[in-house]
Amino acid sequence: MLNIAIVEDDPQAAGTLTSYLDRYAQERGTTCNSVIFNDAVDFLTGYKASFDLVFMDIELPGLDGMEAARRLREVDRSVILIFVTNMANFAVKGYEVDALDFIVKPVAYFPFSIKLDRAVKRLESRQERELLVPV
């Protein structure tokens, strides 16, 4: 099961991501548990490292997605971060906060599923390494 946070202020965009996650889970025979946050402050307040993946909009009211990602990295270095934006010029800045990738709005399912496959592979690789480390 994947635990996913969607930090997105546009209800339509958040709904699209949620429906794509449902479709992805059905196609791959897995489960995606997603939680939507309408702004970055709500997401970061009381944050606990319980998410495997975060989809983060860059243009958010109040605290923008780039600054939210910087603050997220202060408390959780390992969560996988994918930016969702209509501003492709921010893609390079995403690497400053160790983002795995970015998705340009409007989001289409095929590129979304490829990026999610990449995130899942990274999670699986991380879990395998954790299993191999002797205690």
Question: PLM features: what roles do these ranges have?
Answer:
Residues A25-S34, V79:
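A generic structural motif
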